[in-house]
């Protein structure tokens, strides 16, 4: 697909690679900070579930998973800004000249972006995991549970569900970018939505908030760590997965309809 290949070329730019680099460095730092707090004997209600999970097969993903909020934010910024930039920088019309099929163009861009986000996530988790394993072994802490077959299966479940979460967040970012057509507005609204509205809704309507997109997406990887660490899907994993897929489908359909009917003046 022409649009897909064209988008892949953009990932060689330092500005794009910088986002992936920040994701890796920040997540590794948070993971090591969490590891240090656990192994240094620090206590507190927030640390107790992490300390209890630490020696188990889910211990490694519990530690590196503490950087998930940052991973989501960076992935959302990368996708949203990349799509919205086509309007802000006035390049969308030129792209449509080379690829007249609007939906093929949008699909190609999103496939490339999701691939890049997935690769960035894989590198982030691998590097963070390697750092924590090396740090643990240097202190004489057993990592046998983490590297056992059951531990590896837990890692793969976490990675697979984290990919689903980031795909959902990327599609949300696509929708916001298509609606706003501005980098500043798209990134601002996307981050604001992730940080504020669903939390406010949960205060007044807790049961309903459990089905909102960001929460449902977060429940997927949250289901692979101990319940005390979470967030565990209160509606059950299967229901959360089905609703997440429905949200993703809705984002794709609305984005496609809006993009198809937009007047392109850029």
Model-inferred region functions:
Residues 104-106, 259:
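Alpha-helix N-cap/helix-start motif at helix boundaries, enriched for small hydrophobics
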Residues 242-266:
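Junction motif at the cytosolic side of a transmembrane helix
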Residues 30-37, 183-219:
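Transmembrane helix segments
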Residues 1-16:
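N-terminal Sec/SRP start-transfer signal
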Residues 10, 84, 95-97, 173, ...:
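Helix-capping/transition residues at the boundaries of transmembrane alpha-helices
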Residues 79-103, 110, 266:
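Transmembrane helix boundary and interhelical loop/hinge segments in multi-pass membrane proteins
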Residues 1-5, 146-149, 265:
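Short, membrane-interfacial amphipathic segments enriched in basic
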Residues 16, 21-82, 106-179, 220-246:
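Secretory targeting signals
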């Amino acid at each position: 697909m022409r649009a897909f290949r064209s988008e892949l070329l953009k990932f060689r730019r330092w500005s794009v690679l910088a986002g992936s680099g920040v994701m890796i460095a920040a997540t590794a730092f948070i993971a090591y900070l969490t590891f240090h707090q656990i192994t240094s004997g620090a206590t507190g209600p927030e640390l107790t579930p992490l300390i209890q999970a630490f020696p188990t097969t889910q211990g490694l993903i519990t530690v590196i998973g503490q950087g998930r909020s940052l991973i989501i934010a960076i992935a959302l910024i990368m996708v949203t800004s990349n799509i919205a930039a086509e309007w802000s920088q006035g390049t969308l019309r030129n792209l449509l000249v080379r690829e007249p099929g609007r939906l093929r163009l949008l699909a190609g861009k999103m496939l490339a972006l999701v691939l890049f986000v997935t690769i960035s996530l894989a590198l982030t988790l691998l590097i963070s995991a390697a750092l924590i394993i090396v740090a643990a072994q240097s202190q004489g802490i057993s990592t046998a549970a983490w590297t056992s077959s059951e531990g590896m299966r837990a890692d793969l479940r976490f990675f697979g569900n984290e990919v689903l979460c980031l795909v959902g967040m990327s599609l949300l970012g696509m929708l916001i970018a298509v609606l706003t057509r501005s980098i500043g507005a798209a990134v601002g609204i996307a981050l604001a939505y992730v940080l504020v509205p669903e939390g406010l809704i949960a205060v007044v309507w807790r049961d309903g908030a459990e089905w909102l997109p960001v929460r449902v997406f977060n429940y997927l990887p949250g289901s692979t760590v101990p319940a005390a660490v979470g967030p565990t899907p209160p509606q059950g994993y299967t229901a959360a997965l089905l609703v997440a897929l429905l949200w993703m489908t809705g984002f794709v359909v609305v984005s496609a309809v809006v993009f198809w009917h937009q007047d392109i003046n850029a």
